[in-house]
C-alpha cells in the first residue's frame, strides 16, 4: 500500500511539474519600443524640471535672506533679528512644503506619473495576460528586473510577440 501511494504521489508531482510553462519578457526593451511610454516620460521630466526650479528658487531666496541677515545682524535690534529669523524660517518651510507637495510620496509628480503610465502598464499587462492564456503560461517573469535570472532560453522570450500584440512591430 505504501508503494502504491508513493508511486501515485510521484506521478502527480511529475504531471504537475510538466504542466507548468514559463515565459520571459524584457520590460525595459518593451517600454523603449512603446512611443506612448517615451512621450509620458518626457512629459514627466519636463514637469519635474519645472517644479524643481520652483523649489530651488524658494531655497535660493531663503539663502539670500539668510546672507542678508548675517550681514545686517550687528545693526539689528532683538525684535528685528527675531522678525528676520522668522521670515527666513517661513521661506525655508515654504520651500520644504512645496517640495513635499510636488515630490512627496503622494505628491503631484506621483499622481501625474500614475495618470500617464497606468493606462500603458494596463495595456501591457492585458497583452501579457492574453498571450499567457493563449499559450498556457503559468508564470511570466521580467528578465530586466533584478529577479536573479542567470539564463533564460530565447525560446521562452516573448518580448517581441508582446510588442506585436500591442501593435508596435
State what each model feature region is.
Residues 6, 10-18:
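Hydrophobic h-region of N-terminal signal peptides that target proteins for export
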Amino acid at each position: 500500500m505504501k508503494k502504491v501511494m508513493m508511486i501515485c504521489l510521484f506521478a502527480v508531482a511529475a504531471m504537475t511539474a510538466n504542466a507548468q510553462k514559463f515565459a520571459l519578457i524584457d520590460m525595459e526593451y518593451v517600454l523603449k519600443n512603446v512611443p506612448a511610454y517615451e512621450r509620458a516620460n518626457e512629459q514627466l521630466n519636463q514637469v519635474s524640471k519645472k517644479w524643481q526650479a520652483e523649489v530651488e528658487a524658494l531655497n535660493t531666496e531663503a539663502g539670500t535672506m539668510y546672507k542678508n541677515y548675517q550681514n545686517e545682524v550687528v545693526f539689528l535690534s532683538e525684535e528685528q533679528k527675531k522678525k528676520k529669523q522668522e521670515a527666513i524660517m517661513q521661506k525655508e518651510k515654504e520651500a520644504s512644503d512645496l517640495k513635499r507637495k510636488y515630490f512627496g510620496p503622494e505628491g503631484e509628480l506621483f499622481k501625474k506619473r500614475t495618470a500617464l503610465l497606468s493606462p500603458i502598464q494596463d495595456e501591457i499587462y492585458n497583452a501579457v495576460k492574453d498571450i499567457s492564456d493563449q499559450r498556457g503560461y503559468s508564470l511570466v517573469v521580467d528578465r530586466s528586473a533584478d529577479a536573479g535570472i542567470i539564463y533564460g532560453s530565447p525560446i521562452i522570450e516573448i518580448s517581441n510577440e508582446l510588442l506585436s500584440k500591442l501593435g508596435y512591430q
